């Protein structure tokens, strides 16, 4: 069968799939190597510690005044339920009182921070 745009069903499905994947895919991850986790720690200390705290519990000096409270990265259940893609999106775009880091941190730096915050729940 041909669609109204002149595509047969198979070509239409392939084209639609490519378009869908290209608009929803998250950029390539940085590997959670010890080196990248260490770099993520340095970035976390510079950009995240004031709200999320030194131990990732969301109890940093600036975080105490925020509502809702910053995410507690030590909550093993919550962290296990979070996908890397979802956390990366929240770091990138921000959420609630948390600012977006899309323009403040490079993509690989955001992945490094993500890998570091995962260490709090281990």
Kindly label every feature range from the protein language model.
Residues 64, 71, 90-120:
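Axial heme c-ligation environment in periplasmic c-type cytochrome domains
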Residues 12-22:
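Bacterial N-terminal signal peptides
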Residues 2-14:
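Bacterial N-terminal signal peptides that target proteins for export
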Residues 25-43:
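Electrostatic cytochrome c docking/interface patches
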Residues 40, 44-54, 98, 113, ...:
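The canonical Cys-X-X-Cys-His
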């Amino acid at each position: 069968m041909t669609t109204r745009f002149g595509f047969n069903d198979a070509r239409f499905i392939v084209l639609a799939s490519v378009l869908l994947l290209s608009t929803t895919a998250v950029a390539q991850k940085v590997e959670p190597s010890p080196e990248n986790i260490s770099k993520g720690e340095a970035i976390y200390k510079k950009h995240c510690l004031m709200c999320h705290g030194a131990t990732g519990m969301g109890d940093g000096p600036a975080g105490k005044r925020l509502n809702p409270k910053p995410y507690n990265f030590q909550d093993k259940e919550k962290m296990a339920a979070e996908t890397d893609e979802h956390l990366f999106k929240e770091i990138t775009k921000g959420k609630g009182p948390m600012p977006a880091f899309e323009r403040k941190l490079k993509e690989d730096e955001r992945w490094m921070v993500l890998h570091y915050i995962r260490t709090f729940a281990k």
